Every structure is written in C-alpha cells, then in structure tokens.
C-alpha cells in the first residue's frame, strides 16, 4: 500500500529543505520521525509533520481497503522538494536605493509504502 502527503508553499528555501529530506529518504517511517524530531534544521519541523501526515494517510487508506495496517512496515520510498513561487520584497537602502529580497518557497512531497511494495519499485 502506498500513501502520499504534499506540503505546498512552505516558507523554507528549497536548498535547505532538500538537506532535511535527504536525511530520511529510504528510511523506515518511525526511524525518520525520530531523526526529524532531533534534527537542528528549521525545515525539519514541517517535514516531520509531512511524514506524520503520510503515515496517517496510509492508515486511512488501509482502513478503507480493509487491509491490516502495520506502521513499522512503512518506508519512505520517495521524498523530494520542488521550488515554489518566490515572493519578491524590497529592502530600502541609502540614497533612495532599494535591494530586492527573494523569499523562496518549497513544495515538499513524501510517499510512504509497505516494505513488500518498496522492493517491487
């Protein structure tokens, strides 16, 4: 069984989010949650919530299909970060100048699947 969770327009730069996502890609879901809980990066909190949501989506999907659900059998099969829209802001500077500040956003996707399906991909 496969389940997906997507977080869009996260106010974290894609480069910083990718550092966090690379820590948990391919890991067991419960192990990934433990890693993210103690990670120092600011992007680890939204990714933690996203992995939790993906596990919950898998639980709902298993209940709906009448399958047995085992949280320990779930692995993160896919995890990637795409660049979202950039908010452009201006910082006033001396003598009438203005510097542009790019506030970048990210779209993060996490896919979890059972161990038996992980080997089939």
UniProtKB/Swiss-Prot annotation:
InterPro entries noted in UniProt: Ribosomal_uL22, Ribosomal_uL22_bac/chlpt-type, Ribosomal_uL22_bac/org-type, Ribosomal_uL22_CS, Ribosomal_uL22_sf
Keywords: Ribonucleoprotein, Ribosomal protein, RNA-binding, rRNA-binding
Keyword RNA-binding in record: yes
Cysteine-cysteine disulfides: none
Keyword Ribosomal protein among record annotations: yes
Superkingdom: Bacteria
GO MF annotations, alphabetized: rRNA binding; structural constituent of ribosome
Cited PROSITE patterns: RIBOSOMAL_L22
GO CC terms, sorted: cytosolic large ribosomal subunit
Biological processes annotated in GO: translation
SUBUNIT field: Part of the 50S ribosomal subunit.
Family: Belongs to the universal ribosomal protein uL22 family.
HAMAP family in the cross-refs: Ribosomal_uL22_B
Biological function: This protein binds specifically to 23S rRNA; its binding is stimulated by other ribosomal proteins, e.g. L4, L17, and L20. It is important during the early stages of 50S assembly. It makes multiple contacts with different domains of the 23S rRNA in the assembled 50S subunit and ribosome. The globular domain of the protein is located near the polypeptide exit tunnel on the outside of the subunit, while an extended beta-hairpin is found that lines the wall of the exit tunnel in the center of the 70S ribosome.
Designated name of the protein: Large ribosomal subunit protein uL22
Recorded name of the encoding gene: rplV
